[in-house]
């Protein structure tokens, strides 16, 4: 998906189109007032105060019609410089522009004119409105002025603009495809997820079928970790403020945390991450160098107060479950343990068919002694160790100077999802600081107490985001082992006792063999029930008629296919068990 903000050509064009939209709105609603209309990654938007009027699809159509008229007229776009006092006089009846102007430094201010419309703007802009003719208004929403919930609501209208009609058409097709792949839409159709503002924004809930998928992901990654010597724990999702002051998160991360809760004279917070709890688990026991590495893992509930505008289903919420682990190692073990983490990441990606990713090795800026822990030898050794592992494994990566955490270098594995922008799915970070903050030690070979190094790592990232990623990549066509309902039994008739008895016998047979089967014997036509099962992306549809009941066989069709295959019950079960055991990817 194109990034309008980073493409200079598109950025200028879309900025101008935002002004065309504002001019059209002003023609239709003379009382309208405007806050800001920037270019963003997805195109442009303008925040508009329409008084008691509300934007709907009919209003959008009317605005687009007026915009086309303005573009056809081909109005010249002029840049002017005015003094701050002149600008204040020019916009004296517009509280929003006055607010913007009052926060500008003294000196000349730029405004842009096009026909009967003038707007405060830094620019740049194209020179004629006719260049903005290939546009589309794509969505609208209500937002608080300045993003502050204590302020009134404004109408935000989004749009896109391209130099050619062909580029616009191609982009709109991409948007339509993205809409079909959106995990929120898929989650609703497949009865996986729900949300309700009464529960809270950014707090989606997993329905029974969605929780089945979530549990399969949990079982999958915990099984892999157990085989590699991980020890799983469970820790509370709250902690004292003092815990986070000790870790340093209170000073550096407080704005992303929920407010403290005062209980019996103590301040508690919902945890945003699990490192402090895992540090305390390590500190609970004395350790020798012979005990290390110690790998503590947890599927942990975390809470972060994300801005409401960034929330997106289970991809980005205020509550999520992280596939977290902390590896306590000696300096000599950094390379081997990091190598094992990288292996685990890419073995996992192979199981899910993930191939479109980018590895980023984030390093310190050696000139910045303020941001980064000041130990050149430590940094050089750590960065060289991570480079060596990636090079030895033949993994392509880019280096980003100055992007390391203050406590050590890290590897991020970023994916390009089917919907939206690139984000980090997996990470492994070296930490030389946190163990010291908690006075963690081990007794080394020489009998002296030493401070361990910690590797923070998340393979699936958060299970929630990983599930969103897989749903969008597969369009909900999950591999059989992940599918919430693996086989749907559909008797051709629901009033045939012999057929219904066989259907229930088969249902029990599959359940007894750990197949997630269901049976639909409603008094609906077979075609209707088949279509409904297709919408829910059920991998196997079992069509049972009199012949199957008499022969004790199974006639099945795969999701999205029309042809039917008939086999014995045992053959069908063996086929499913093999597909589940080998974790075959979606067909």
Predicted features and spans:
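NTP/phosphate- and nucleic-acid-binding module
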Residues: 1-35, 39-41, 47-587
């Amino acid at each position: 998906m194109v990034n309008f903000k980073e493409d200079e050509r598109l950025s200028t064009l879309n900025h101008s189109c935002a002004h065309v939209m504002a001019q059209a709105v002003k023609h239709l609603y003379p009382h309208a007032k405007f806050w800001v209309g920037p270019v963003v990654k997805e195109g442009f938007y303008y925040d508009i105060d329409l008084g008691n009027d509300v934007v709907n699809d009919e209003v959008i159509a009317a605005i687009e019609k007026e915009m086309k008229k303005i573009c056809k007229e081909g109005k010249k776009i002029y840049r002017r410089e005015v003094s701050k006092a002149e600008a204040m006089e020019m916009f004296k009846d517009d509280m929003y522009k006055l607010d913007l102007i009052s926060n500008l430094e003294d000196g000349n201010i730029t405004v842009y004119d096009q026909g009967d419309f003038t707007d405060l703007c830094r620019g740049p802009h194209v020179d004629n409105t006719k260049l903005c003719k290939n546009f589309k208004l794509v969505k609208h929403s209500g937002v608080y002025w300045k993003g502050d919930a204590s302020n009134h609501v404004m109408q935000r209208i989004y749009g896109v603009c391209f130099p050619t009609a062909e580029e616009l058409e191609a982009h709109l097709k991409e948007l339509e495809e993205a809409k079909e792949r959106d995990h929120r839409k898929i989650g609703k159709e497949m009865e996986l997820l729900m949300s309700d503002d009464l529960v809270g924004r950014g707090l989606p809930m997993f329905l029974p079928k969605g929780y089945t998928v979530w549990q399969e992901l949990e079982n999958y990654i915990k099984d892999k970790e157990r085989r590699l010597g991980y020890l799983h724990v469970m820790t509370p999702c709250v902690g004292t403020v003092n815990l986070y002051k000790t870790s340093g998160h209170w000073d550096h991360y407080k704005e992303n945390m929920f407010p403290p809760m005062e209980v019996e004279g103590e301040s508690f917070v919902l945890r945003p991450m699990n490192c402090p709890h895992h540090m305390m688990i390590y500190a609970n026991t004395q350790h020798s160098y012979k005990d290390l590495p110690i790998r503590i893992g947890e599927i942990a509930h975390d809470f972060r107060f994300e801005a409401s505008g960034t929330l997106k289903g289970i991809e980005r919420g205020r509550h999520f479950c992280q596939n977290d682990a902390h590896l306590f190692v000696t300096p000599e073990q950094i390379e081997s343990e990091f190598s094992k983490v990288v292996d685990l990441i890419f073995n996992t990606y192979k199981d899910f068919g993930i191939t479109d990713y980018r590895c980023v090795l984030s390093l310190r800026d050696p000139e910045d002694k303020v941001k980064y822990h000041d130990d050149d030898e430590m940094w050089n050794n750590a960065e060289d160790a991570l480079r060596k592992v990636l090079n030895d494994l033949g993994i392509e990566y880019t280096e980003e100077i100055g992007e390391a955490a203050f406590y050590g270098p890290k590897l991020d594995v970023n994916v390009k999802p089917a919907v939206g922008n690139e984000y980090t799915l997996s990470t492994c970070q070296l930490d030389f600081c946190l163990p010291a903050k908690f006075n963690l030690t081990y007794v080394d070979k020489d009998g002296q107490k030493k401070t361990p190094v910690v590797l923070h790592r998340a393979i699936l990232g958060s299970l929630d985001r990983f599930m969103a990623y897989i749903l969008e990549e597969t369009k909900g066509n999950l591999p059989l082992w992940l599918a919430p309902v693996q086989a749907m039994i559909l008797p051709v008739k629901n009033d045939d006792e012999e057929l219904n008895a066989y259907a229930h016998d088969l249902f029990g047979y599959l359940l007894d063999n750990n197949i997630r089967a269901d049976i639909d014997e409603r008094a609906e036509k077979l075609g209707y029930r088949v279509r409904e099962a297709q919408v829910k992306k059920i991998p196997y549809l079992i069509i049972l008629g009199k012949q199957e009941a008499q022969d004790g066989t199974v006639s099945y069709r795969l999701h999205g296919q029309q042809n039917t295959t008939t086999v014995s019950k045992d053959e069908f079960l063996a086929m499913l068990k093999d597909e589940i055991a080998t974790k075959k990817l979606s067909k």
